[in-house]
Design a protein with these regions (language model features):
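Sec-dependent bacterial lipoprotein signal peptides
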Residues: 1-20
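Short, surface-exposed polybasic-and-hydrophobic patches located at secondary-structure transitions
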Residues: 95-110
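Short hydrophobic/glycine-rich mini-motifs in sensory/regulatory modules
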Residues: 120-122
Length: 151
């Protein structure tokens, strides 16, 4: 009887420990996404001391460029600054001249800045506390017709 009781207790412990295993796996995925964003071509490159100065120079340069390059993003056409692309891995703006990622992101979900085309919602987000990024973001917002929906 005692042996069966111990077996049941151990089985219950094993079943309940799956939750903690899943939490660890989710935490690893989240930390990988954060690290990927802080690489040179990610949107969080400005947070990395190694790239910070170069990213700010790239932002100043891109702010002076016209917003006239048409690119495909998740089935729609967007207009972005020339000599930039949307990074396929992080969905952030990437400067082709320097290779630095900018804190300007695109998504296929609704953000505060969104645009609906044929029933699909596209979002734009940018760090408006960094000098130059707000300028670039406003230009992209205006060129593509994104609408601010948050209050």
């Amino acid at each position: 009887m005692m042996r069966r009781l111990m077996t049941i207790v151990i089985m219950l412990l094993m079943l309940s420990s799956c939750y903690y295993f899943n939490q660890v796996v989710d935490d690893i995925r989240d930390s990988n996404a954060v690290e990927r964003g802080r690489k040179k071509d990610g949107g969080g490159a400005y947070k990395n001391d190694k790239y910070k100065e170069g990213v700010y120079k790239a932002i100043d340069d891109i702010a002076k460029r016209p917003v006239n390059k048409k690119v495909q993003f998740e089935g729609t056409e967007l207009i972005i600054p020339e000599n930039t692309v949307i990074n396929n891995d992080t969905w952030t703006l990437l400067d082709l001249k320097t290779g630095y990622g900018l804190p300007i992101g695109f998504s296929n979900e609704g953000e505060c800045l969104k645009k609906t085309i044929k029933g699909k919602v596209y979002g734009l987000s940018y760090n408006d506390y960094i000098s130059g990024v707000k300028e670039i973001g406003k230009k992209i917002e205006k060129a593509n017709g994104f609408i601010y929906t948050c209050k």
